[in-house]
Amino acid sequence: KFVSINPVKTGYSAIADEWLGIRPGTDGLFVHSIIYELLKANKIDWKYLERYTNSNWLVYNNPGNSNHGLFAKDENNQPLIFCKTKKTILKSSEENKKPSFFGSYNFNGNNVVPAFELITKELLSDNFKPSIVADQTDIKENVIKRIASEIAETAFEKEIELPIEWTDMNGVKHDKMIGRPVSMHAMRGISAHSN
């Protein structure tokens, strides 16, 4: 399914399966509302986040301190995570770890939290509820919720599995590739707006 979210119904919007006429300059707000819904429904690819992103890396959470917002690193400049099974802070490159995406921890007298904790705190704000965003974007609440639901269904119930061996960035070999047949092409819209 091809959904076009654009203020005007020209070009690719005219041939899309569905066109959503959005108020100019609010596409970032719309995307935040989609993310809000996906977080609420727990439709998150945790394995992907764990393996291929820095969302579980610890961040200094010390407002007013010079290290606030920076990644916590060890003496060798290696990013750190909190391991749920070992109940301790480890290097992100450590093997046999189960990183936490949530929580607050102490590292050398500093408060640190996983980056995902900060992301969810921001994106689960009432500001991004579809009921609030609908009035600002001109896209109805039920449509925002439906689009989020369709993204989740396609990503998690229609995944693609390819029997192709590959090696990831950490040198770990895999016997198959998992694909989530969902994408978004934002063109210049999101980068050119303040929301």
Where are these regions (language model features)?
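Structural beta-strand/beta-sheet cores of well-ordered domains, especially the beta-sheet scaffolds
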Residues: 1, 18, 180-182
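Short, acidic/small-residue loops that bind anionic groups at enzyme active sites
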Residues: 1-8
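Generic beta-strand/beta-sheet core signal
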Residues: 5, 22, 185-187
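Long, well-ordered, tryptophan-enriched scaffold segments
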Residues: 8-14, 18-166
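Acidic catalytic cores of enzymes that act on phosphate-bearing nucleotides/polynucleotides
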Residues: 144-195
